[in-house]
Every structure is written in C-alpha cells, then in structure tokens.
From Swiss-Prot:
Reported function: Blocks the elongation and depolymerization of the actin filaments at the pointed end. The Tmod/TM complex contributes to the formation of the short actin protofilament, which in turn defines the geometry of the membrane skeleton. May play an important role in regulating the organization of actin filaments by preferentially binding to a specific tropomyosin isoform at its N-terminus.
Region (Disordered): 39-61
Pfam families (alphabetical): Tropomodulin (PF03250)
Oligomer and partners: Binds to the N-terminus of tropomyosin and to actin. Interacts with FLII.
Keywords: Actin-binding, Cytoplasm, Cytoskeleton
Protein name, per record: Tropomodulin-1
GO molecular function annotations of the record: actin binding; tropomyosin binding
KW Cytoplasm (keyword) present: yes
Amino acid sequence: MSYRRELEKYRDLDEDEILGGLTEEELRTLENELDELDPDNALLPAGLRQKDQTTKAPTGPFRREELLDHLEKQAKEFKDREDLVPYTGEKRGKVWVPKQKPMDPVLESVTLEPELEEALANASDAELCDIAAILGMHTLMSNQQYYQALGSSSIVNKEGLNSVIKPTQYKPVPDEEPNATDVEETLERIKNNDPKLEEVNLNNIRNIPIPTLKAYAEALKENSYVKKFSIVGTRSNDPVAFALAEMLKVNKVLKTLNVESNFISGAGILRLVEALPYNTSLVELKIDNQSQPLGNKVEMEIVSMLEKNATLLKFGYHFTQQGPRLRASNAMMNNNDLVRKRRLADLTGPIIPKCRSGV
C-alpha cells in the first residue's frame, strides 16, 4: 500500500513542464540514461531514433558566391582522364538510310457509260436502297438516306436490307427452379426410418434453421436407409459440422456426405475428417468452397487422417499447396486400388496388396 501511495504523488505531474525546465546539460544526461535503458530505441518512432548532429560549431563563415567560384575553378583545373584508345575520327559500318514508306495506290476514277451516270445522278433515295439491296453493298448510302427512303415507303426490295440488321433470336433460358424438398416432412421420414428414402437433398435452401440441421444429424444416427445426404449452400456452420461428425461415428449406412459452399471453419472440417476412422461406410466426402480458407496446418492434418483411412474413395476439396494435394491424391488412388483388388479377389482368388507407404 505504501508503494501505491508514493505513486499517487506523480499521477498529476506535467511531463512537458518538467522537460521544459531542464538545461541542455541535463537533457544530454537524461538522453544518455535513456540510451542505457533502451539501446536500440525500440520505444521511439523511427524518425526520432537518430541523434541530433546539427549542433556543431561552424568552422568558418559561409559565403555562397565564394563557394561557387571555388568549385568552378577547381572543376576547370581538374584534367579529364585520357582515353585508353584515342579517337581517330574513323567511321565504321554502314550509313543509316531511312526506308521509304510504300506509296498508297491511287484509285483511278471509274468511268461509266453516260446513260448509267445520268440514271445514278437522278436516282432517288428509294431507288438507291433497291440497288444497294440487289448488289449487297449496304454501305453505298448513309443511314440518314436509308431512313428517309424507308419512311417514304417506296422501297421495292426491303428484305435485302432488313435481313442484314436483324438480330439473332436466342431461346430464353428459364431460371433454375428452387428446391422443392419439404424440410419438416423429410425430417420426419428420417426419424421414422422410411425405407423408400435413400437420398436427402437440401441444397440451396437458405432458410433452414441451425437447430433443424442439427436435428437431421441426430436423426441420421438411427436411420438405416439414407445413403446420400447433401446440404450445399444452406448456411451451415461449425455446430452443424460437429453434429455431423458425431453422426458419422455412429452411422453405418451413409455413403455420400456433401457440405460444400457453407460457413464451416477449419475446426468444423477437422472434426468431420477426424470422425472418418470410426466410419466404414462413407465413400465420398465433399467439403470444398467454404466461406474462409482452412489454412496449411488444417490441410496437413486432413491429409494425415486421409492417409490412415482405407474406405474413403472420393474427397472433394482443392488443396492450396501442392504437397498436401499430391498426398491426398495418392491416398484416394490407393483406396480405389484396394477396392479393385478386392473385386478381383472375389472373382479369381485372394491377392495380397502392397503395403502403403507413410501409413
């Protein structure tokens, strides 16, 4: 308590007033003591770490004109360094001659028969439109002449002109229909273990509450028929991923799980992958395109878990680094190779698989 009372005396002191009352000698002493406390000046801004070096006494009077005259005289007295190879004035190489630009050919004036010249000179805009349509020369007349002739409604051949500017008619493409899955009804069917329900697709249904998605995960623990479960673009987050991870530890029927395009972080994705050793039925897992990147550490842990799993055949995620990407690809290739060997063993006999490296 006595130490705190001593500090109370210095609480209301004005540091600027104290520094302003110090002499130059006292300021230098204070600066030296601060240098001992902080030799690298890490507590000072970068612009204040260098000591003041402009307080030196001048060595003599400064006269600008005399200094310039001295520098000019010194520059004139200094001899230039002689060239190692003296310049003889000999010219080498070819003299550069600019290339002549090619002359544009002059178009000769076309002379028509007097009857044609007279006919064209006296032709109206509508007749010029007909001639342009027949010859296919639609630049023969300006737009103003064309629209004036079109307004006079005296053009005979309108198809030849209109067919050039007619736009291409594209077939209208309808928007994708919204997902018509009844969320509550599907949840009840999962809870009732409906044998006809083998695929649950809740993709792009954005108004599903988080407790409802967690209820889906709880219902899938006891379900024996659902093989595909997809919740792409449903705004699912980490609590949903944690519930799905607990479901994977119990469920023995689900084969495909798709949680792409959601708000699951690296912790949620890692919980899903850590549940794979407890599940022997899942063959496809898609986790790509989340709201935030997983990071290199999470990717390395995911690859380590994939290398220890022998049942997963497809893993949907684009690794950012080449090392984890190659390791995950090799793990999936080895798992598919094991499935192929088991299938051949059922047909021809047992085949002893090779040991997987790094497992």
